[in-house]
Design a protein with these regions (language model features):
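Flexible inter-domain linker/hinge segments
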Residues: 1-7, 26, 84, 275
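Iron-sulfur (Fe-S) cluster-binding segments and ferredoxin-like electron-carrier domains
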Residues: 19-36
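Radical SAM enzyme core and accessory elements
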Residues: 239-385
């Protein structure tokens, strides 16, 4: 728990393949009463160092408060791991009215200047169109109040990937829903005269995700004007479907083989696409795109601007051998390339003599050569004292 934050409910019916919340908190959302939440808010207000800002009114997913099945008996016998994937269950009540009542009650307390939502928001629940029009209206009202009153400047959401194939295995909604939510977010911001941001969370190296998927993710997020920061590499966690697939190499439901990036080089080859905008990553990204046969994405990522930078030595494509830094790779001229090859042909002793001569010419004192860090060895004679 973060100081000055209030946990309103526990449990999550999202059932994401990489998440353990449903395993240790349960699939059914258990909510605190509005009176209990207001009572805790009053205790926070009474704290001597409280400045009037509640950092979070949330839970595992901020907007699952008050949601449950219409027929609870059917829920008790249901074997679906997720109530919202591949589509929202028709038995699920997705009304945001109770959540809005809590927000209004907390904001009305004297001493509360503003209450923020720091937990992640499920935008698929906001955009879901149910048969109940009042529920749909409450969802739009929630979106407007959330964006205009309860965002500190950045709203956190978790699309996790852009490939629908990978998202299907993750049990996450299609990325097209994120486009729709971003349009709604931008529209409300424009109408309210705000300049707030969406902060999307993404995962690399998830089972089923390839380098090509991450390359397309980089192109798509660039088109949305994102410079990603809130990212992580997939970490196997007990009691999850994704970890079962990572360990076994098979989809546990279909028993079909599934690709998993496991070695550090394979993981780095995916992770670096998050940071396409960093100059030090460009050389490795271009080599990797050529290796996987997607050189067409280079122009989309870098707008056709030719790369003349110097890449890191270890940032080479997965499975490739170290390349010589010749004029074609690093923009060196023929003379510089020849000097580099001549220097590589020199023996260790020749290089040491050359360095010593350069130091003498520059008037620098030549430091004694030490071949061991053992204090029992003399640095000049290299013999034991």
């Amino acid at each position: 728990m973060i100081k000055f934050s209030i946990n309103m409910h526990r449990g999550c019916f999202g059932g994401c393949a990489f998440c353990t919340i449903s395993a240790h908190q349960g699939k059914f959302v258990v909510c605190r009463s509005k009176e209990s939440i207001v009572k805790e808010a009053k205790k926070i207000i009474a704290m001597p160092d409280f400045k009037g800002y509640i950092s979070d009114l949330g839970g595992p997913s901020a907007n699952m408060y008050g949601m449950h099945g219409r027929n609870l008996k059917a829920c008790e016998h249901c074997k679906r791991p997720s109530c919202v994937n591949p589509m929202v269950c028709p038995n699920l009540i997705t009304d945001h009215s109770k959540l809005l009542e809590v927000y209004h009650a907390v904001d009305a307390l004297p001493g509360v200047k503003k209450s923020f939502i720091g937990s992640g928001v499920r935008y698929d629940l906001i955009l879901h169109k149910s048969k109940d029009e009042k529920s749909n209206e409450a969802a739009m009202q929630y979106a407007r109040e959330l964006i205009t009153r309860h965002v500190s400047g950045r709203l956190k959401v978790a699309p996790e990937n852009t490939s629908d194939r990978v998202l299907k295995f993750m049990r996450k909604p299609s990325f097209s829903l994120f486009y729709e939510f971003k349009r709604l977010f931008d529209k409300i911001n424009k109408e309210a005269g705000l300049r707030q941001q969406i902060i999307p969370y993404f995962i690399s190296s998830h089972p089923g995700c390839h380098e090509e998927d991450m390359a397309e993710l980089a192109v798509i997020t660039k088109g949305l004007d994102f410079h990603l920061e809130q990212v992580q590499d997939f970490t196997p966690t007990p009691m999850t479907v994704a970890t079962t697939a990572f360990y076994s190499g098979y989809d546990p439901y279909t028993l079909e083989p599934i690709f998993c990036a496991k070695t550090p080089r394979e993981k780095l080859a995916q992770r670096m696409f998050f940071f396409w905008y960093k100059p030090e990553e460009r050389g490795a990204i271009e080599r990797e795109l050529r290796r996987i046969g997607r050189a067409d994405l280079i122009a989309k990522l870098y707008d056709g601007v030719q790369y003349h930078g110097r890449a890191r030595y270890d940032a080479k494509a997965v499975g490739s051998s170290p390349e010589r830094p010749d004029k074609h790779e690093q923009g060196r001229g023929r003379r510089q390339g020849q000097e580099w090859r001549d220097e590589r042909r020199q023996t260790k002793g020749q290089r040491a003599d050359r360095q010593a001569q350069a130091q003498r010419e520059n008037g620098q004192r030549q430091k004694p050569k030490r071949t061991s860090f053992n204090p029992n060895f003399h640095p000049k004679t290299n013999k034991r004292r």
